Amino acid sequence: MRLEFFEVMAKKIHFIGICGVAMSALALAFKRQGWKVTGSDVGFYPPVSTHLKEAGIDFYPGWHPEKINKPDLVVVGNVASSTNPEWLYVQEHKLNYKSYPEVIAEYFVKKNSIVCAGTYGKTTSTALLTWILKEAGFDPNYMFGGLMAMPTNGAYINTPLQFFSSPSQTVPP
């Protein structure tokens, strides 16, 4: 049975590779929806580390399978090679996992979504479109791999009615 994003509260999710701009935005969106969020990566630097810390997300440097505490879902980033200890742990313990594109496709993209695609300017176009709609009185959901001058940075989830995305070549067909 498919879990609908807005029906699930107080779940646990772990991100392997949480420090990227897009993965951290996704982690922040789940946190704002009430999920317990944890993550790992090889390096943490401002402003991403600052946003994660301010949101109360537990994250740690390196790969430590023993710190993965029975999550309902593991999001596996591109940084997880076939020899990554956390990725091996997820497979060995048969934990529920998805890639970043799979999470976007399942939880965010709806039939009335708008995805800004192209070679250059996707993040800027998505942020500008989001700002225009907010100024016009709409409250769209959005997700993009960039840090903008918005209180929610690269992700905001309110309702499943409107969603804007900058896919960065990651949204499946």
Where are these regions (language model features)?
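Short, ordered loop/turn segments at secondary-structure junctions
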Residues: 42-43, 64, 102-103
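ATP-dependent carboxylate-amine ligase
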Residues: 1-45, 53-59, 70-74, 92-95
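Generic non-transmembrane alpha-helix signal with a bias for helix starts/N-cap capping motifs
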Residues: 23, 45-46, 83, 126
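Short acidic active-site motifs
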Residues: 47, 63, 70, 151
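Phosphate-binding loop of NTP-binding sites
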Residues: 4-8, 29, 53, 67, ...
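Conserved beta-strand-loop-alpha-helix hinge of the TIR/SEFIR fold
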Residues: 60-63, 82
